[in-house]
A protein has these predicted regions:
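N-terminal accessory regions of nucleic-acid-interacting proteins
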Residues: 1-45, 198
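Conserved DEDDh/DEDDy metal-dependent 3′-5′ exonuclease domain
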Residues: 45-46, 50-154, 162-164
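Acidic, Mg2+-coordinating catalytic module of metal-dependent nucleases/exonucleases
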Residues: 144-204
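Accessory interdomain/linker segments of ATP-dependent helicases and helicase-like nucleic-acid enzymes
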Residues: 190-268, 635-638
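Pre-ATPase regulatory/linker segments immediately N-terminal to the P-loop/RecA-like helicase/translocase core
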Residues: 191-196, 242-377, 427, 431, ...
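Conserved P-loop NTPase motor core of helicases/translocases
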Residues: 356, 410-416, 420-509, 518, ...
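Conserved RecA-like ASCE P-loop NTPase motor core of nucleic-acid helicases/translocases
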Residues: 390-392, 397-430, 437-440, 569-574, ...
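Conserved helicase motor core of SF1/SF2 NTP-dependent helicases
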Residues: 418, 488-490, 503-638
Length: 638
């Protein structure tokens, strides 16, 4: 069935494309109609886009397009096909997705290829438009940027951005259509481009990557595209730009080419703009519509921000794998250890007799902590997984290991999910006289969190201060071989170019808060750091799960890999909670394996209050239980 669709991405008056565009709804059993159109019209490039179900990440709609025709395909009817017809459909789809005479073109082509391979069990060959014209830095182009460069400067960039974060069927179709328009404008570049080819990887690797990327898509679908901003003031600077003074770091207006900033007055007057710069608590906004007269009462950000450095590094790794630029997914022993393990003989654990004499800090640890330190120092345990309940001395155990590495001049990087987690490790290392440096992003530090680092300011390096001058970087590091940062900082391209990995190679990687980190975040890092030979993961899977676990239940932390459970270490003594409370937690949460050492032993330190009549009430972005609050006040007054 044919109809028409009108696009609003490229102004019609430019005469670049035909209006309206023919739209054909095609069932998965009629893929041959697309093949016929490609053959009959000698189509050189076919744009492609897809939509995934927010429930389970399966592909429900695929759009194929030329500059004049869009074919909307529903894949949801595949399961209803009889055997022979399903085979025929698969054959047609395979010929379409692997056609060497007609280039499939898409933004994030690696993702598209993995999703189609997983859903349809067919191999895909295509071209990634986002990196087709990348410069020397390899930064990918957004659809709006590439349309501006290759189609016309007057394209509607904000509408193009919106088409890529919205998932209405029309948006899916227009994404495929614009991909085709851009591809058709550069036939020579398509012919010489590196191809994304699923045949570059074995099926087991493709399935693994497809499953991991499905989790990512589910998480991205949950991200808000409308965020309210808390602000202190809005002023006009000498260049005519608005300056927002943000009140909260968590919802600050960030510099972005892909989002729109909406400022509203009490009378409904609206100003729209783009956040073009950010410094500390202030964000500069270039006004695109409306006049500023003061009295701003509400600020919101519409759209989806650019990927982080870590997200770009992850996606770039997957793209290079499928293009054949990386020889194998499993060239890192740590990728093999996590996702493709081979049977390993159980490592014997020595007693460490005599070590206490030459390591006083080790002598002060309990036996479970000593066992972990010995494993971290051992050459025959490349992966050390440590389950540490609260108050069991995880950070202290890490510090003792680092103290020895620091004494021997052996480099180690210590990372955590959050800046606060990294800072807490730094405080412990100071007590152990470990020489270290801590790298913090300018965005997090300046004006927002400088007070957190006052006691370690001389050890702090701002990431933006690491310049590509080997002498200056060496001066800043100052001989330190222990480096602290967040897991995302390891993907910052500034660290790659400044030479810090030459001065302090990533040979040992210690991860705190590992139970809150999706293991997929490490895959590209394992491949990146070829000298890595020791990985130590600390966390507590009984506490906070990684963000998004409810949305993507198949997400795994290191503690979800069953083959590590028999050899994982357990820190079995807690020192933080009074003994009665510790024993209760041990019995209810840790299978009675957690011992308690504390000066408070009396049962009166614990009170249980029945609040079965309580109910959660929504308060802003959080929840409260009024009955609990009343109970807390009552108990406090006893």
């Amino acid at each position: 069935m044919s109809s028409f669709i009108r696009q609003d991405l490229v102004p019609p008056h430019l005469g670049i494309t035909r209006q309206p565009i023919v739209l054909r709804n095609v069932s998965s059993r009629d893929i041959g109609a697309i093949l016929s159109h490609v053959s009959d019209n000698d189509v050189h490039a076919l744009g492609v886009s897809l939509r995934l179900s927010p429930k389970d990440g399966t592909v429900d709609v695929v759009a194929f397009a030329t500059s004049t025709h869009i074919f909307q395909v529903s894949l949801g009817d595949q399961t209803s096909l009889a055997g022979n017809r399903r085979v025929a459909t698969g054959d047609s789809l395979s010929r379409l997705l692997g056609n060497v005479n007609c280039h499939l073109a898409a933004f994030d082509m690696a993702r598209v290829a993995l999703h189609l391979y997983k859903q349809c069990n067919v191999h895909v060959q295509g071209i990634d438009l986002s990196t087709l014209f990348s410069g020397l830095d390899g930064s990918p182009d957004t659809p709006a940027e590439l349309a501006y460069k290759k189609v016309h400067p007057d394209v509607n960039r904000h509408r193009i951005h919106a088409a890529w974060y919205r998932d209405e069927v029309k948006d899916v179709c227009l994404r495929a259509w614009l991909s085709a328009v851009i591809a058709e404008s550069s036939p020579d570049a398509l012919d010489s481009a590196s191809k994304v080819e699923t045949t570059n990887l074995p099926d087991v690797h493709l399935q693994c990557l497809a499953d991991l990327m499905t989790n990512i898509v589910l998480l991205e679908a949950e991200r808000p595209t409308h965020i309210e901003n808390d602000f202190e003031d809005v002023t006009l600077d000498e260049d005519g730009q608005l300056v927002i003074t943000n009140e909260r770091y968590s919802n600050r207006v960030r510099r972005s080419k892909q989002t729109s900033v909406i400022l509203e007055t009490a009378h409904g007057h609206r100003i729209t703009g783009e956040a073009v710069r950010a410094e500390g608590k202030r964000t500069g906004v270039k006004v695109h519509g409306g006049n500023f007269r003061g009295g701003i009462e509400r600020i919101s950000v519409i759209g989806r921000e650019e990927p982080t450095h870590a997200e770009r590094a992850r996606d770039g790794f997957i793209l290079r794998l499928l293009q054949g630029a990386i020889s194998s997914l499993t060239r890192s022993p740590f990728v093999r250890a996590l996702w493709f393990p081979a049977p390993q003989p159980r490592v014997g654990r020595g007693s460490g007799d005599g070590e206490d004499a030459w390591s006083p800090q080790l002598a002060a640890l309990n036996e479970s902590q000593k066992a972990v330190v010995r494993a971290m120092w051992a050459d025959d345990e490349p992966v050390v997984v440590v389950h540490g309940p609260p108050g069991t001395g995880k950070t202290r155990t890490i510090a003792v290991s680092l103290e020895e590495w620091d004494r021997c001049g052996e480099p180690a990087w210590v990372i955590a999910q959050s800046n606060v987690g990294v800072k807490n490790i730094a405080r412990t290392l100071i007590k152990h006289n470990v020489d270290f440096k801590i790298i913090v992003s300018k965005e997090f530090y300046v004006e927002w969190h400088e007070h957190l680092y006052e006691s370690i300011e001389r050890r702090l390096i701002r990431a933006d201060e690491l310049i590509a001058d080997p002498v200056e970087v060496e001066r800043m590091i100052g001989g330190s071989t222990i480096i602290l940062c967040t897991v995302s900082m390891l993907s910052n391209p500034g660290l790659d170019s400044c030479g810090i990995y030459r001065l302090a190679p990533v040979e040992r990687l210690i991860v705190d808060e590992a139970s809150q980190i999706d293991s997929f975040e490490f895959m590209h890092l394992f491949d990146k750091f070829h000298r890595l030979h020791k990985l130590c993961m600390f966390g507590d899977p009984k506490q906070l799960p990684p963000y998004g676990k409810e949305t993507a239940p198949s997400m795994k932390t290191i503690f979800d890999f069953k083959h590590f459970k028999p050899t994982a270490y357990f820190l079995n003594t807690q020192y933080r909670m009074p003994v009665p409370l510790g024993e209760f937690i041990s019995e209810e949460v840790y299978n009675s394996k957690l011992k308690s050492v504390h000066k408070i032993n009396d049962d009166s330190c614990v009170r249980f209050v029945d609040v079965r009549k309580g109910a959660e009430e929504s308060v802003g972005l959080s929840w409260k239980v009024r009955c609990c609050i009343v109970s807390f006040v009552f108990v406090a007054n006893l």
